[in-house]
Amino acid sequence: MAPRLCSISVTARRLLGGPGPRAGDVASAAAARFYSKDNEGSWFRSLFVHKVDPRKDAHSTLLSKKETSNLYKIQFHNVKPEYLDAYNSLTEAVLPKLHLDEDYPCSLVGNWNTWYGEQDQAVHLWRFSGGYPALMDCMNKLKNNKEYLEFRRERSQMLLSRRNQLLLEFSFWNEPQPRMGPNIYELRTYKLKPGTMIEWGNNWARAIKYRQENQEAVGGFFSQIGELYVVHHLWAYKDLQSREETRNAAWRKRGWDENVYYTVPLVRHMESRIMIPLKISPLQ
């Protein structure tokens, strides 16, 4: 059986213009066949259908939605443990005013505390309708907002550190919409190898259908400013048991295993956060 598997590898590599086989290639091919038992030959066929064409456009142009000009900002605030309750109360008193004020072209998408992952952490997701001009308009107005400046001064005493990123949403994900609760949310963050964002998007565009039956898919984003080649997938579940059952169900669907097989090599690092919504969060 081994020589036959090796000859397949040689043929495939000649067609693709790659180098000759190595010992690890034979093991990888065998693992791929075992990985998709119910789909004989899928490993060989996938060598041809998953090739990504070279592009001249930026991946932000190719992967983001054309019909909207939304820009997103995600904030991670690491709070001093003794101040977490006070931080939440202060946040819930001030941020909704910006969300409801039509003079500010920004809106809250979601606000959470991290439950499992980094402790004593708050995560905020904002939407700027109108892209970078809306972001700058909002930032300029906040410089003259006395209440917001006081909020920032008070908040700074409660924080250990903070960071943010500007994001675009993938074209094949639905735009995040308010949800009734109670739900828990999972933010899965993937740090990709440079140059692999388009391949990631191509694979997930085919695979997202396997993760929508229970309405668990909330939003998918990729970074534009801040740490680059970072992807965030946001999911909603009723509870941890529901999360377990939903994720296991995906593995029983033909095609999901191939998506995992082809996207795992693109990842340098991945992280999962389980988050609980704050009272003000539109995503409950």
UniProtKB/Swiss-Prot annotation:
Q: Its Gene Ontology biological processes?
A: mitophagy; sensory perception of pain
Please describe the organ and tissue distribution of this protein's expression: Ubiquitous. Highest expression in liver.
Give the source's domain of life in one word.
Eukaryota
Compartments in which it is found: Mitochondrion matrix
- Annotated positions of the N6-succinyllysine modification: K146, K193
Q: GO CC annotations?
A: mitochondrial matrix; mitochondrion; synaptic membrane
Q: Does the keyword Chloroplast apply?
A: no
Any one GO MF annotation of this record: protein-macromolecule adaptor activity
Please give the residue positions where the record annotates the modification N6-acetyllysine: K65, K66, K73, K80, K143, K146, K191, K193, K279
Post-translational modification, briefly? Answer: In response to mitochondrial stress, the precursor protein is ubiquitinated by the SIFI complex in the cytoplasm before mitochondrial import, leading to its degradation. Within the SIFI complex, UBR4 initiates ubiquitin chain that are further elongated or branched by KCMF1.
Q: Which positions carry Phosphoserine? A: S129
Pfam families, per the entry: NIPSNAP
Q: Which UniProt keywords apply?
A: Acetylation, Autophagy, Mitochondrion, Phosphoprotein, Transit peptide, Ubl conjugation
Q: What is its main location?
A: mitochondrion
* Gene3D superfamilies the record matches: 3.30.70.100
Q: Where is this motif: SIFI-degron?
A: 2-15
- Transit peptide limits: 1-35
Binding partners and assembly: Interacts with CALCOCO2/NDP52, NBR1, SQSTM1/p62, TAX1BP1 and WDFY3/ALFY. Interacts with ATG8 family proteins (MAP1LC3A, MAP1LC3B, MAP1LC3C, GABARAP, GABARAPL1 and GABARAPL2).
Family designation: Belongs to the NipSnap family.
This chain's function reads: Protein involved in mitophagy by facilitating recruitment of the autophagy machinery required for clearance of damaged mitochondria. Accumulates on the mitochondria surface in response to mitochondrial depolarization and acts as a 'eat me' signal by recruiting proteins involved in selective autophagy, such as autophagy receptors (CALCOCO2/NDP52, NBR1, SQSTM1/p62, TAX1BP1 and WDFY3/ALFY) and ATG8 family proteins (MAP1LC3A, MAP1LC3B, MAP1LC3C, GABARAP, GABARAPL1 and GABARAPL2).
What name does the UniProt record give this protein? Protein NipSnap homolog 1
- Per the UniProt record, the source organism is Homo sapiens
